[in-house]
């Protein structure tokens, strides 16, 4: 038996704001929604990953009050440093940037961090041995 990670379920204080955030910044799309929990339950996925990994987003959570130096986060890989900078610029305008773009030694790479409307941190990185193009990068 080999378990496979298929989803992450999140209770959030503002469902619509979280759905909008993940659409806008993470290019995720709603692939399913249904009535539930007094409102609705939403499944979101990256294009092409609808059958492999999703976020299940539900109403009813508490706002997470993470410290700026708390590195608990969801991580998304990008294809270039310029894309990291672009996300950071958009996040500055939206007032949700928590970690300015920075370079760290391998395997961390170049990254920035955003705060979603529920208080979760979301990292956007380039140069890690994960995600698009990572097959050419050795594991640490």
Placement of each model-derived feature along the sequence:
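Hydrophobic pocket/interface hotspot
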Residues: 18, 22, 84, 91
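Short, charged/polar, Gly/Pro-enriched secondary-structure boundary elements
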Residues: 49-55, 118-121
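Short beta-strand/turn micro-motifs at beta-sheet edges
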Residues: 58-64
């Amino acid at each position: 038996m080999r378990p496979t990670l298929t989803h992450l379920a999140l209770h959030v204080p503002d469902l619509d704001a979280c759905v909008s955030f993940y659409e806008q910044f993470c290019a995720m799309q709603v692939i399913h929604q249904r009535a539930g929990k007094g409102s609705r339950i939403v499944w979101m996925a990256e294009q092409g990953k609808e059958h492999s990994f999703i976020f299940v987003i539900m109403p009813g959570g508490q706002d997470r009050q993470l410290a700026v130096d708390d590195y608990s986060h969801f991580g998304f890989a990008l294809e270039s440093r310029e894309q990291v900078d672009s996300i950071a610029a958009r996040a500055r305008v939206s007032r949700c940037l928590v970690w300015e773009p920075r370079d760290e030694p391998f395997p961390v790479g170049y990254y920035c961090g955003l705060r979603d409307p529920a208080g979760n941190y979301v990292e956007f990185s380039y140069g890690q041995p994960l995600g698009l193009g990572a097959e050419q990068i050795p594991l640490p």
